[in-house]
Swiss-Prot record:
It catalyses: an acyl phosphate + sn-glycerol 3-phosphate = a 1-acyl-sn-glycero-3-phosphate + phosphate. One of its GO terms (molecular function) is acyl-phosphate glycerol-3-phosphate acyltransferase activity. Pfam families: G3P_acyltransf (PF02660). It comes from Shewanella woodyi (strain ATCC 51908 / MS32). GO terms for biological process: phospholipid biosynthetic process. This is Glycerol-3-phosphate acyltransferase. Its EC number is 2.3.1.275. Keywords: Cell inner membrane, Cell membrane, Lipid biosynthesis, Lipid metabolism, Membrane, Phospholipid biosynthesis, Phospholipid metabolism, Transferase, Transmembrane, Transmembrane helix. It is an enzyme of class 2 (transferase). It is found in: Cell inner membrane. Pathway: Lipid metabolism; phospholipid metabolism. Belongs to the PlsY family.
Amino acid sequence: MTITALTLGMILSAYLAGSISSAVLVCRLRGLPDPRTQGSGNPGATNVLRIGGVSSAALVLFFDMLKGALPAYIAFRLGLDSVSLGIIAIAACLGHIFPIFFHFKGGKGVATAFGAMAPIGPELALLLMGSWVLMVLICRYSSLAAIVTALLAPFYTWYLDDRFVLPVAMLSALIIIRHKENIQRLLKGEESKFSRKKTPKT
């Protein structure tokens, strides 16, 4: 790995892009409660689903994934090495987790991390999405689904395109570290299960 002005610029740009909190902005635009103070307190798509419904959560998920996908794809097209790609992707996730524009209080970084992995190929994107959805259907724990999918991601990548195993493993490690408290709650049986906002009957 060679640190160049281009690499440093991409790292900074990725962090700043990641710092744009899609959850907070979507909730403000739609007149919803602040996701940092409602539900689980996590400004991410899953919590927005709880407090705002499917369409709001879908918007948050799309933009959170885009924050990871764009920097990773641009860095790849610029010919940066795999370690640099991993660091740039992590910078986008760290922006989401510690956003400079929102008092450094952000989310878990799952969607942004998976978004950064997605440009590797549609097969990987489908495997990641399928693994997460399957785990949610089986256990109803969004956090456990994210952890299991993160653990599987390097193996999927090794099978599909082993050039990117290292950056994917770096992102997977970050996801698992960010879920330390969730793991503790899962072990104690105290973790909240996946749910969405119920539409009032008329």
